[in-house]
Amino acid sequence: MNNAGHGPTRRLRGLGVLAGVALLAALWLLWLLGSAPRGTPAPQPTITILVWHWPFTDQPPELPSDTCTRYGIARCHLSANRSLLASADAVVFHHRELQTRRSHLPLAQRPRGQPWVWASMESPSHTHGLSHLRGIFNWVLSYRRDSDIFVPYGRLEPHWGPSPPLPAKSRVAAWVVSNFQERQLRARLYRQLAPHLRVDVFGRANGRPLCASCLVPTVAQYRFYLSFENSQHRDYITEKFWRNALVAGTVPVVLGPPRATYEAFVPADAFVHVDDFGSARELAAFLTGMNESRYQRFFAWRDRLRVRLFTDWRERFCAICDRYPHLPRSQVYEDLEGWFQA
């Protein structure tokens, strides 16, 4: 028998076996490397947020190193020390202090590529001077849901355990107002309601101011609270709704953005919207004619949810760190006024 052709075949088979063994060895080595204990991941750098003007005051609060940790945000350094301008990861400017003078901005000293944040919790009706701020800011912090850093005045969070008992209600409706102007829609609606509904009015506008600690317990005595915003704008739902009504344990009667906006934040049966009625007389009749069973349905949400307020500017500014890794560095608001007025 002639075996001349078997030599090359055997050599090829041998090479194939060797290649297979080498492949298995490589796979085994990769598996070992993948399953080996990994080293400690590199710590994430701390983000420094410089607040150029502290809102409504020349004296910023104390800002210890753990300020943002208190709000559940780690590796975030909040400072009002302007000497950090060159090294800060972002600088935030509150609009009220910029409202009349663009010169308050350190434009000449701005490091290249440093994100600047425009911050305001006021409505467009009370925000002026935006036309002077074109092409300056990269991000926006506001109550608008489409803001880069969205900070509402409040929200509902899951809650387990018994809800606090509702205060006893001995009166019908209350309203706390400091700046009463007849041209405002809320003033006109109040004038239309007054002949049909007993509304007790508190605040500087009526010569009956309430101290900060007095407001909630005072309103808690009423079945309804007029949560009338001073102007009606997209997503503009303030403490008049969250604190003055929901925290106080009363039913808010709301004048503000459309019902659908409120329903994005709270259950549909947690409030009364003025748009649901054809006239102030109809609204008053609904409120005064409501039986106790129907009234209690407005508080069904309290069995599973609780109100969380966002009133501290420190917490609001710390939220920048939470969003920082996800925000576009190259974005610029060329027409901040057009965006905010939309």
UniProtKB/Swiss-Prot annotation:
Enzyme class: transferase
Record topology, Cytoplasmic segments: 1-14
Similarity remark: Belongs to the glycosyltransferase 10 family.
Gene: FUT7
The protein's name: Alpha-(1,3)-fucosyltransferase 7
Induction: By T-cell activation. Up-regulated by LIF. Induced by IL1B. Induced at higher levels by interleukin 12 in activated T cells. Down-regulated by IL4.
Function per UniProt: Catalyzes the transfer of L-fucose, from a guanosine diphosphate-beta-L-fucose, to the N-acetyl glucosamine (GlcNAc) of a distal alpha2,3 sialylated lactosamine unit of a glycoprotein or a glycolipid-linked sialopolylactosamines chain through an alpha-1,3 glycosidic linkage and participates in the final fucosylation step in the biosynthesis of the sialyl Lewis X (sLe(x)), a carbohydrate involved in cell and matrix adhesion during leukocyte trafficking and fertilization.
A Gene Ontology molecular function term of the record: fucosyltransferase activity
Swiss-Prot/TrEMBL GO biological process terms: CD4-positive, CD25-positive, alpha-beta regulatory T cell differentiation; ceramide metabolic process; embryo implantation; fucosylation; inflammatory response; L-fucose catabolic process; leukocyte migration involved in immune response; leukocyte migration involved in inflammatory response
Cystines in this chain: 68-76, 211-214, 318-321
Documented EC number(s): 2.4.1.-
Activity regulation as described: Inhibited by NaCl. Inhibited by GDP in a concentration dependent manner, with an IC(50) value of 93 uM. Also inhibited by GMP and GTP. Inhibited by N-ethylmaleimide. Activated by poly(ethylene glycol) by enhancing the thermal stability of FUT7. Activated by Mn2+, Ca2+, and Mg2+. Both panosialin A and B inhibit activity with IC(50) values of 4.8 and 5.3 ug/ml, respectively. Inhibited by gallic acid (GA) and (-)-epigallocatechin gallate (EGCG) in a time-dependent and irreversible manner with IC(50) values of 60 and 700 nM, respectively.
Membrane topology note: Single-pass type II membrane protein
Glycosylation sites: 81, 291
Thermal properties of activity per the entry: Optimum temperature is 37 degrees Celsius.
TM region positions: 15-36
Tissue expression notes: Leukocytic/myeloid lineage cells.
Lineage: Eukaryota, Metazoa, Chordata, Craniata, Vertebrata
GO CC, alphabetical: Golgi apparatus; Golgi cisterna membrane; Golgi membrane; membrane; trans-Golgi network
